[in-house]
Amino acid sequence: MRFISLLLLLTLIFCSKEATGTSDRISETTINLDNIETDPWWNDAVFYEIFVRSFYDSNADGVGDLQGIIQKLDYLNDGNPNTDTDLGITALWLMPIFPSPSYHGYDVTDYRNIDEEYGTMNDFKALITAAHARGIKIVIDFVGNHTSDQHPWFTASASNESKRDWYLWNSNKPSYNGPWGQEVWHERNNSYYYGVFWGGMPDLNYTNQEVTNEIKNTLRFWKEEVGVDGFRIDAVKHWIENGDQQENTAATLAWWRDLYVFQKSLDPGLMMVGEAWTSTQNIAPYSDKRLDYCFEFDLSYALIDGINNQTNSGLKSKMSEIISTYETNQYGTFLTNHDQDRSFYRFGMDERKAKLAARILLSLPGVPYIYYGEEVGMLGQKPDEDIRRPMQWTSSANAGFSSTQPWHPLNNNYVNYNVANQQLESESIWSQYQIWIKQRTRNTALRSGNYDFIESNNSRMFSYLRADSESNTAFAVIHNLSSQNTDDITIRINNSSLTEGTYNLINILNNQNMGSINVSSSGAFDTTLSEVTLAAYSSFLLKLEGS
């Protein structure tokens, strides 16, 4: 049942009529957000980000495509939790699949079609059907802040036709630059239009209600007629400008609040995750019933830096801020994405660090995202094309990606770092991803349990308690960020949600008893795991079992 009252709908209609002018006329509606039902399936998901062009080529043209993803679904999740040949992810984020003049697709020319290099709408619907049969959700990249300058809307706007005010025009070039000092006003036909990223990506004018209505109808199309499970929304903080204030404006936040109500009216389970590339405190308002959640960039930096610098201080403080800032678990976690140097490159090709990063990512709270190829140690350093290279499937010609020359050169390390090789090794990067994905999927405490930092006598240990009262399960997760083995590990918590009693610490990866703890009535414990050694860049996943 969808709980949206008639009064709420009338309020939205009235607000929409008032939202056709400049940005200062857009204000947040007064609505009872508690009356909006949501179905947060993403809290139980492990996402996998795919650049379709680089995943798998099914038709020998050197370009990855939708049929290629279909052919590789059993690698991602074969639908059988008892097998160990699939990775085990439960949701896909597809980078842009709309028609576009660029290889990356972030400048759209048609919001209701599929890039012909990737396939057809029927191919995409077949992918959704096949994915759903395996328990995999499908989320698509929606680039709504701007279009291509080749989009029919913009060509009509530039020629002073009916869609002039679908974009932002000025007869004289404003004097200000963009948020990072870039040119944002671009000349066309003796006028200037606004494009925060570059001239080939003109920003849409969301103070025009016609634009908002068109985008809402487009989202409805992809949900109701095509069947997607959600959207990753690009560049959410740039939606509406107020003069030279070009990020995080009040009008932008108001627009997203209105869209949230619309989104949940389509389907309580329709997910929207936002890219707001900014600090935790600036991200937080977008996650407050405007989008379901946003990506946590600061945490990704803290995670990689913590491993490289062998200290828990940044991770400890960042997790403390996150826990106090967001609604429980409502943030996306990741190592790196398609806009950043790949994590294996950041770790200097140290496999131990790559494995440790995977274990931390998959045992922390939040909604984890894996960038394709991360699980096999793909390398990549900017420019962007080089962090989006073809997937490394095998050591054979073209890395098993295609039977012909790929659209972009392969990484040199594909002969050793590929799916086929790593699936044969029990201690490979791939194996660590698979093992910890499955542990997360099987254990509610690792997906949605409480998080409490575990103090230690060693700043190179990053440890925490994940506890779930409903399933009555808890885990102590202990990571050694150091390049040295660590003995006699002290673990200490002053209070937690644990009930009083004595618990054995069982390493669920090998069923070994690692000792015990005595928990007080406040949930506190303090013990030393004597005669226990945690190897460099290694982890313990200890289940607390009452004795």
Which sequence ranges carry the predicted segments?
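C-terminal beta-strand-rich structural cap/linker in extracellular carbohydrate-active enzymes
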Residues: 520-547
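Loop/helix patches that line or flank the sugar-binding groove of alpha-linked glycan CAZymes
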Residues: 42, 260-266, 278, 287, ...
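Solvent-exposed beta-strand/loop surfaces of large extracellular or lumenal domains
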Residues: 506-527
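N-terminal structural segment of carbohydrate-active enzymes
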Residues: 24-140, 145-147, 152-156, 162-163, ...
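C-terminal motif of bacterial Sec signal peptides marking the signal peptidase cleavage site
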Residues: 13-14
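Structural recognition of the beta-strand scaffold that forms the well-ordered cores
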Residues: 46-49, 91-96, 139-140, 230-232, ...
